Each structure stands twice: as C-alpha cells, then as structure tokens.
C-alpha cells in the first residue's frame, strides 16, 4: 500500500459526503489513493464516536491498523475484518452481533456473490450487491461506504461526464446520487517519474450538477 496520506479531512465534509441511510460509492482508478482515503474516513468517524466496521479485502489487516489513529480513551471504535471474499450474508452475520453506524468495504468488486443469486454473470451480481448494500443501509439507518476500483482510462477533460464512463451496470439515478470520485490530475499525466503529489478533487454529481471538494495528497 502507498504510505502517502491526505491532509486532515474535517468531519463536516465527511458527514456530507457519506450520509446515513444509503450506500456511498467511493470510486477511483488503481493507485489514486482510495484505501488511504477510506482509512481517513474511518479515523474521522471513530474520532467522533461512531463505531466503524472496516472490511479490507485487498490488504492485510495490519496495514490498515497501522494507519488508524489511536483512540484516546482506550475504547475500540474501529473493527477490522480481513477475511477474503466476504459475502453480503457474512456482513449481515457480523452486524447482528454488534451495532456499527459505519461500514466500509474495501473494495466491493472483491466481494463474493450473493448465494441465492448463483447463475448470474458477474456484472449482474455486482449490481445486486450494490442494491442490497443500499437496502441494508436504509433499513438500519447507517452509513455504508463501498470502495470501487475503476478501469484506468484517460479522461477527456470533462469530469462531469465521468459517471457515464464507469459502472454502467448501475442505474443512472442510483449512481448519480451515490458516487464520489477521487480525481488526481497528475495521475493522468504522462510524467512517470514525478514525485509531486498534487491536490485531489472529490467529485459528486447529485441534482444534475457536480460539487468538488479539493483536498491535498501528501507524503
């Protein structure tokens, strides 16, 4: 994992970007910094007293734990689960045993299929998984944040049309209201040995317009 970091994200911004009662899609290409950003999200929610469950399907749990802030009062606010290929049924079993107001899944494409949906192709499975996660968030009034890896492509310069270029198996309305895209300009440049890590935009697309939350990616 790239041990770069983001500047401190404020709770107000995180609370707006990832509301309760729905699944939020945190999407970016490989190497942009999705996991580091997701850990910062977990840190903020834990710091403000929200019990957080972090499913890390790509990395060892020790890599995640090493980047979590210690909680001053000694209470463990963040639980890490690194069991590979978890399914929606596995998530349901965990949250039945303990309440979590925040669930982060890093990342959803590595989840196992829903057992009752055997026979579907992977694209249809992923659509059902996202819809089921959204239903789970609504029924329990919790935040579910699903990290999603996009195919690395060169964007044509118009970030507003980016949602139309990714995750096309999801309904347009569903995707528009839930997707948050990490966009780092130099990630798409031709410079292969640049050491500069510039600003990162968090782009949202609700209500037919985009909002950009600029943050800083640092070493």
Regions found by a protein language model. Give the residues of each.
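The Walker A/P-loop phosphate-binding site
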Residues: 1-72
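Short gly/ser/thr-rich secondary-structure transition/capping motifs
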Residues: 4-11, 85, 161-165
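Phosphate-binding/switch region of NTP-binding enzymes
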Residues: 14, 131-219
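Structural motif
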Residues: 25, 102-104, 145
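Flexible loop/turn segments at secondary-structure boundaries
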Residues: 33, 60-64, 110-114, 152-155, ...
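Generic beta-strand/beta-sheet core signal
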Residues: 29, 55-57, 81, 105-106, ...
